[in-house]
């Protein structure tokens, strides 16, 4: 039996790339996945694939680059009667270019998603995991954080 069998796993940024692949793989390993991103069409497509595998998928559409979005997502998931055994903070993005070419809103949304919402979700779910007697948090990062990247100062620092 897989470690993930029966575990409820929340995956942010699940509409594409790493998050999409993680959701598929974890569902195949027996996890019940809770997927979130901005694009409902992609999440619904993924949920259909997961359900065809015989696993459960719960879809929550949320733009995690907005302030208070982590709290909103947490409350929606709780209201649906779901607990989270494993949180995978995968959502994130970067913009490249000279810092002076960005509007404040551009880098503020990047920092909100890559740092603040990630931290909010950890802060919200960690006490629940302690009460449950265990859990796990995986924060997906970028190699760009390990060394300076030209034209990506905000992304690299986040």
Regions found by a protein language model. Give the residues of each.
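Active-site loop immediately N-terminal to the catalytic Tyr-X3-Lys motif
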Residues: 100, 149-153
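Conserved glycine-rich Rossmann-like NAD(P)H-binding loop of the short-chain dehydrogenase/reductase
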Residues: 29-46
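Conserved NAD(P)H cofactor-binding loop of Rossmann-fold oxidoreductase domains
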Residues: 90-95
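Conserved glycine-rich cofactor-binding loop
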Residues: 8, 15-17
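The beta1-alpha1 cofactor-binding region of Rossmann-like NAD(H)/NADP(H)-dependent oxidoreductases
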Residues: 41, 61-72, 104
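Residue(s) in the substrate-gating loop at a strand-loop-helix junction
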Residues: 142
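Substrate-binding pocket helix/loop in short-chain dehydrogenase/reductase
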Residues: 98-99, 106-109
């Amino acid at each position: 039996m897989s470690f993930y069998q029966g575990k409820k796993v929340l995956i942010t940024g699940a509409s594409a790339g790493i998050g999409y692949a993680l959701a598929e793989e974890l569902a195949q390993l027996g996890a019940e996945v809770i997927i979130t991103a901005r694009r409902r069409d992609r999440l619904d497509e993924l949920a259909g694939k997961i359900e065809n595998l015989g696993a459960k998928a719960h879809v929550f559409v949320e733009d995690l680059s907005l302030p208070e979005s982590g709290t909103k997502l947490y409350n929606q998931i709780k209201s649906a009667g779901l607990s989270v055994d494993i949180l995978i903070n995968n959502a994130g993005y970067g913009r490249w270019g000279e810092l002076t070419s960005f509007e404040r809103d551009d880098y503020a949304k990047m920092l909100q998603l890559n740092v603040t919402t990630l931290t909010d979700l950890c802060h919200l779910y960690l006490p629940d995991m302690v009460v449950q007697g265990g859990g796990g948090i995986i924060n997906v990062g970028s190699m760009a954080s390990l060394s300076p990247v030209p034209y990506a100062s905000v992304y690299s620092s986040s």
